[in-house]
């Protein structure tokens, strides 16, 4: 407002100028600073070393890819101002002339070549290396298994402003995949100078709307506006702080005390109704392309027996968990992929129509066939990462499995970073998990279950499933692709690879002083450049 008012009064007399000065001073009293709870300490700020939502929430503001998602979840130009394609296979991206790194140097096509090659390089060890393969970028699969060098990846700088990407198959939704954290560029010179320490505030060079200012591990990350960002004139928040509060109860209590402006996206049931009554206008509940489920270690005995996995799946009362315990608008999940995703709307599996008692009896019969009974009950550990809500749900789930199918379940708690490591290493039986879409299309979920996917911590391996997703790529239209996705989802259910529980909502508290949040993006990105602090009336 101050800039607009100042320009409109140029040429007026001293009194007008004095009036504007006083108005500007009043406006400046509104500090454009914001505090957001991010729910956990991040594992890293290197986009090629992370896989979780807390990390993406921060990196989203520090680095910008070829495109980003707007307030409605649509892909819009980021570093790339335009693009074209030939049969959805060869893509040409034209970069902005004014796209710059936070040190003032230009962002070029070669930066994306370097970054994507780094992502594909097995030496990087990225948990998201398979994303390039899922996007069907030429030679990505061979590079990931060491058969070809990273330089063979199908990405090429035609000149400083034009990037060519070649795919092995047509991918109509390829552009929508490019806003993902792993596809953002990293600064080659910063990495060469500082190695793994390039993400420290004193070394960080980014190209996003904000730059890393301070990082106190297990406490806070502070970012400030990047004056070199191409659209900096439309950013209003000057400084943002991300807190690492894992306790949802502490999160809401600190929100109520005024310390936090935007809470994390999960409100504990014990406080949800209280917030509905006390502050209904500050409570935002929106659909979220995220599935809460229990992950089963498919390669570990006895869970390599599909009868055991199906019994665990059928023995959980997901309806009670969803509608009575959490009860914030979540939808009961009978499959992995949310039914409201683009090209979704999947048919429910047959067991979804069984009564609870019918499901439990079927589960007991399966366990009996697998050699389990009252004298020899199924025993397993349930791993969950630190969180009040995760703990409560784990206690409830363990109780249900004991009551409904006679299983003996012990609880195992680990911090976020440690739990991720345990799951990747296969050091678990059953684990609490949430998978959130990387883009709005069923493959954002289904690809995770591919046998060679680097995110596949269930260790599910079915060549027939892999073949279905390969077949979907050559489907002639969205309707044909949807039918194949339905078959893939049905196969996941038949194999009982996971225990789906519910499709999440984003439930968060937002102070009335914060504007710019619309909540229409089902990916629920925490994009600070959209926000601003209201001026007092």
Each model region followed by its residue ranges:
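N-terminal lobe/hinge region of extracytoplasmic solute-binding protein
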Residues: 37-87, 203-206
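Extracellular/periplasmic solute-recognition and catalytic clefts
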Residues: 213-224, 241-300, 323
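Structural transition elements
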Residues: 331-369, 387-392
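Long beta-strand-rich cores associated with HINT superfamily self-processing modules
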Residues: 508-537
């Amino acid at each position: 407002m101050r800039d607009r008012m100042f320009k409109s009064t140029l040429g007026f007399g001293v009194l007008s100028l004095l009036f504007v000065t006083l108005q500007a001073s009043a406006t400046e009293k509104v500090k454009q600073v914001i505090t957001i709870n991010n729910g956990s300490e991040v594992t890293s700020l290197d986009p090629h070393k992370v896989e979780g939502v807390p990390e993406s929430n921060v990196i989203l503001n520090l680095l910008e890819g070829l495109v980003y998602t707007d307030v409605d979840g649509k892909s819009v130009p980021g570093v790339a101002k335009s693009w074209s394609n030939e049969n959805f296979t060869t893509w040409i991206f034209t970069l902005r002339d004014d796209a710059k790194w936070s040190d003032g140097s230009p962002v070029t096509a070669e930066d994306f070549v370097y970054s994507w090659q780094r992502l594909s390089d097995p030496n990087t060890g990225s948990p998201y290396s398979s994303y390039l393969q899922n996007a069907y970028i030429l030679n990505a699969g061979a590079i990931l298994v060491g058969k070809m060098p990273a330089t063979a990846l199908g990405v090429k700088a035609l000149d400083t402003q034009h990037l060519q990407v070649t795919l092995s198959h047509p991918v109509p939704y390829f552009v929508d995949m490019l806003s993902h954290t792993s596809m953002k560029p990293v600064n080659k010179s910063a990495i060469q100078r500082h190695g793994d320490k390039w993400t420290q505030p004193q070394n960080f060079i980014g190209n996003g709307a904000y730059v890393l200012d301070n990082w106190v591990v297990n406490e806070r990350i502070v970012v400030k506006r990047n004056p070199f960002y191409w659209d900096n004139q439309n950013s209003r928040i000057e400084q943002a702080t991300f807190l690492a509060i894992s306790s949802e109860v502490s999160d809401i209590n600190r929100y109520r005390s005024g310390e936090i402006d935007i809470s994390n996206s999960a409100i504990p049931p014990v406080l949800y109704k209280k917030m509905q009554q006390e502050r209904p206008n500050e409570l935002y509940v929106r659909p979220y392309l995220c599935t809460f489920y229990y992950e089963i270690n498919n390669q570990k005995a006895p869970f390599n027996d599909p009868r055991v996995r199906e019994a665990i799946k059928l023995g959980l009362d997901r309806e009670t968990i969803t509608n009575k315990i959490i009860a914030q608008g979540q939808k009961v999940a009978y499959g992995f992929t949310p039914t409201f995703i683009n090209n979704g709307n999947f048919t429910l599996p047959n067991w979804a129509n069984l009564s609870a008692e019918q499901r439990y009896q079927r589960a007991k019969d399966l366990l009996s066939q697998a050699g389990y009974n009252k004298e020899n009950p199924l025993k397993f550990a349930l791993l969950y990462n630190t969180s009040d809500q995760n703990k409560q749900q784990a206690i409830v789930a363990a109780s249900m499995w004991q009551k409904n199918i006679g299983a003996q379940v012990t609880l195992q708690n680990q911090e976020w970073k440690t739990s991720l490591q345990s799951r990747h290493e296969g050091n678990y039986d059953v684990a609490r998990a949430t998978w959130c879409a990387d883009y709005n299309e069923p493959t954002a979920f289904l690809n995770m279950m591919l046998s060679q996917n680097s995110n596949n911590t269930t260790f599910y391996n079915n060549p027939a499933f892999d073949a279905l997703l390969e077949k979907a790529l050559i489907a002639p239209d969205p309707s044909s692709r949807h039918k194949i996705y339905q078959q893939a989802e049905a196969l996941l259910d038949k194999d009982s690879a996971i225990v789906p529980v519910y499709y999440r909502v984003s439930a968060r508290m937002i102070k009335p002083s914060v504007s710019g949040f619309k909540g229409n993006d089902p990916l629920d990105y925490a994009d600070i450049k959209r926000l601003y602090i209201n001026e007092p009336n």
